[in-house]
Each structure stands twice: as C-alpha cells, then as structure tokens.
C-alpha cells in the first residue's frame, strides 16, 4: 500500500534518467551504511520500525490532533482495513510510542532552523516535549487495548 511517486521518472522522456530515478525509488531505506550481502541490502528500516505508512499515520494524529493511543488505534483499524490486521496495527503502534519517547532527546538538541509544514517533531516548531519524557501511560493504554479492556 506504500505510495510511490514515480510520475517524473515515468514521464521525463529520458530512459537513462528514468532508470536511475526508478532504481532510487525501489531501493529500501537503510539506517546503516552496511555493505550488501550477496547484492541485497542486509538491513532495512521498515523491518525494524514497521511500515512507513503506519508510522506516518500515527505521527500525524499524535502531533496534529493530540489523539490518544486508543483513538489512533481505532482510526488506524478503519483506515488500513484490508491492509493490516489488528495485531499488526497494535504491534507497530506500540513500537511507534516506545521509539517516539525514547528518541526525544535527539530532537531536543537540534540546531536552529525553519519549521516546514503543519506537523513537525522539531522543538523549533510546535513540539514542546521534555527530553526525558516517559512513554509509560501511552503504552499502558495500548496494553489495555491488547487485553480487550478498552
């Protein structure tokens, strides 16, 4: 279900350029500059954090509207019906919250720069979150969903 914007590559009229652009689009994002094993990338970010489309969805509704984990979970169930099952959505939502809080210290020490867009995790924009924030409450709500208590 990942959206792939290949319009320019498909319409530029230059085969060599088109081939390079399509190759870039087809290359998975990797967090490390590890050499490929047998010609294949050995580490892919999506394998570690889950589908980007789910994380983008979670991030948007957390930052733009401040929705609770339970509400985001319900919205994701509807939005991704037929693409992801309940367990997959919940698994990656828990991963999202765990990583979102654990990585906050990295965002707090960013250099000055402009805010771009309506949703941002940068402290120079709208996010005012302490570096030592704890994810316990959010993860507890997700555990309640997992147990069927919510």
Residue ranges of each PLM-predicted region?
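ATP/NTP-dependent adenylation/nucleotidyl-transfer catalytic domains that generate, transfer
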Residues: 4-150
């Amino acid at each position: 279900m990942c959206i792939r914007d290949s319009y320019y590559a498909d319409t530029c009229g230059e085969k060599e350029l088109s081939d390079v652009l399509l190759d870039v689009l087809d290359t998975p994002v990797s967090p490390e500059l590890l050499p490929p094993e047998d010609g294949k990338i050995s580490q892919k970010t999506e394998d570690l954090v889950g589908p980007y489309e789910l994380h983008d969805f979670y991030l948007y509704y957390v930052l733009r509207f401040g929705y609770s984990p339970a509400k985001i979970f319900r919205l994701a169930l509807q939005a991704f019906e037929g693409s992801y099952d309940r367990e997959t959505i919940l698994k990656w939502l828990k991963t999202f919250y765990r990583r979102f809080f654990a990585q906050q210290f990295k965002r707090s020490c960013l250099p000055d720069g402009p805010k771009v867009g309506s949703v941002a995790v940068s402290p120079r924009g709208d996010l005012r979150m302490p570096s030592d924030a704890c994810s316990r409450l959010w993860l507890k709500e997700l555990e309640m969903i997992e147990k069927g208590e919510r």
